[in-house]
Amino acid sequence: KKTATVYKGKTTTLKATVTGTAAAKVTFTSSNPKVAAVNKTTGKVTAKAKGTAVITAKCGDVKVTCKVTVKNPTLTLNKTSASVKVGKTTKITAKAAPSGKVTYKSGNKKIATVSSNGTIKGIKKGTAKITVTCNGVTKTVKVTVK
């Protein structure tokens, strides 16, 4: 690969193939280990922080590079606040990059509950905060039950 995109906290493995040499030893280095660290023998890249780094694979005098871009995970919700009547439901839709397990939690289950798929049910009048989390990113939705 000439380029790769990896999300912070995730890994990818770069492979280098050498032809014509029986016992060729390839070593990997990173131009910026604080952004993308690489195991010098396996080529496994760990994304550490947002930014770019160039991973170099070297065998003897031959070098090849791969530009690695590290992105922060994102979580986008279809709404930041919601209104629902007692006994009725509304839904929060979450989009995460990279995709992962999204969790929903009500800060006050006596006012509003939330299911594992983001469906909010109004229990009694008041306000509650719904916390949505994925890949270490947290967002909140203020729910008003009428």
Question: Residues of each region from the PLM?
Answer:
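Extracytoplasmic soluble-region selector
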Residues: K1-K146
